[in-house]
Amino acid sequence: MENELFLQKQNFLVLGLAKSGYAAASILHEKGINVVVNDQKAFEENEPAQRLAERGIEVICGEHPTSLFDQHHITILIKNPGIPYENIMVEEAQRRGIPVWTEIELAYYITNAKFIGITGSNGKTTTTTLIYEMLKADSIKTLIAGNIGTVASEVAYHADGDEWIVTELSSFQLMGTHAFRPEIGLILNVFDAHLDYHHSRENYEKAKQNVYLHQLESDTAIVNQSDETVVRLAESGKAGTVPFSVHQELSSGAFIKDGMLMFGDEAILPVDDIVLPGAHNLENILAAVAAAKTAGASNKAIQKVLTSFTGVKHRLQYVTAIQNRKFYNDSKATNILATSKALSAFKAPVILLAGGLDRGNGFDDLKPYMDNVKAVLTFGQTAPKIEKLGNELGIQHVKRVDNVEQAVSAAFALSNEGDVILLSPACASWDQFKTFEERGDMFIDAVHMLK
């Protein structure tokens, strides 16, 4: 009730009309709260803007007029997570001391449902999906939302108070939270990522820290005991902690002991019974078990999921085998760490397809994981850098191609029986694609064209 009264007193400016902006504007309007929308794309070409305008919402397109702040007495700006803080409207809001939200903050304000918030540099989507499936397998009322594709505010708006909203959270989304408080907060790991957006490791960590920062003593922080940064960030909050570790046996929480997945003194199941491929996924699984057990899931439900769940699309996804060559789609590998983990998952010879948006980093950190790589097909802005890496390692076949389709054809031509052909770009997709999903789908389509 207190949150509702707060919202009713505000005048909102929604900046950016991707899915999250459209949902935020729609919800605020439906609740009778003052809202105006601003989007860079021209109105004539902007279908979401046209739909909002038809409902009586004021939409200003094609420019970013700072006069809107005075004209509409704006008190809160909600921005699309991808819009940089250097945007003129964001800078104007900050200059005026106006809070800058993402729609995750709005989601928190409009529901009485409970949140499980999952973030980290890698593994978020897999872990989020695992937690959701584990709770669902136990008939616990559960919804899934956030960076995984379903807009959190939309889910929260229709959620009941006794439901869990399992929410994948990016650093972009978390940077725009100020009071958001998940009853269960989880940081999987923290590595250098998105420094072009956050400008420093410190800012990136601060964004991630928001998962823990506003928790109460009655809440739970799920903590990767093997990640010093996560342990340090967890100390900022008041919540009790439940640890997990893939590297050490613990007295509580989730860990591996004598080949068994444990939660405290409970043996959940043998690690060999888990069907999700890749040693790196054990960390995601342990985190998911810690969160699911905290939320009330039974061992039986967890066992059911872990003996049947084979992965999420675009995350080390097995596509098919053609002439005894196995194809894997790991398009979600948008950084070096994700690709190194993918390479570590295979003992067979690998033909690596990599490349994409150039964020200014090098690729030397991949070198320790390239022993099984017999060929590299590279594309996108980073192709020269990855080509150089392959040549430095003395890999026999290193070839630059124009796109993913050409990479698939060239990889198949170079392959032998028993090889793995792996799309794991180690780069964001935005130089050639709108999303990593689009890139992964192109890979899958190109693979099926080989049949």
From Swiss-Prot:
Catalytic reaction list: UDP-N-acetyl-alpha-D-muramoyl-L-alanine + D-glutamate + ATP = UDP-N-acetyl-alpha-D-muramoyl-L-alanyl-D-glutamate + ADP + phosphate + H(+)
SUPFAM superfamilies on file: MurCD N-terminal domain (SSF51984), MurD-like peptide ligases, catalytic domain (SSF53623), MurD-like peptide ligases, peptide-binding domain (SSF53244)
UniProt-listed InterPro entries: Mur-like_cat_sf (IPR036565), Mur_ligase_C (IPR004101), Mur_ligase_C_dom_sf (IPR036615), Mur_ligase_cen (IPR013221), MurD (IPR005762)
GO biological process: cell division; cell wall organization; peptidoglycan biosynthetic process; regulation of cell shape
Pathway of action: Cell wall biogenesis; peptidoglycan biosynthesis
Keyword Cell membrane set for record: no
Gene Ontology CC: cytoplasm
Localization (cell): Cytoplasm
Residues engaged in binding ATP: G120, S121, N122, G123, K124, T125, T126
EC number: 6.3.2.9
Assigned keywords, A-Z: ATP-binding, Cell cycle, Cell division, Cell shape, Cell wall biogenesis/degradation, Cytoplasm, Ligase, Nucleotide-binding, Peptidoglycan synthesis
GO molecular function, one term: ATP binding
UniProt enzyme class: ligase
Family (UniProt): Belongs to the MurCDEF family.
Function: Cell wall formation. Catalyzes the addition of glutamate to the nucleotide precursor UDP-N-acetylmuramoyl-L-alanine (UMA).
HAMAP family according to UniProt: MurD
Protein name: UDP-N-acetylmuramoylalanine--D-glutamate ligase
Record organism: Bacillus velezensis (strain DSM 23117 / BGSC 10A6 / LMG 26770 / FZB42) (Bacillus amyloliquefaciens subsp. plantarum)
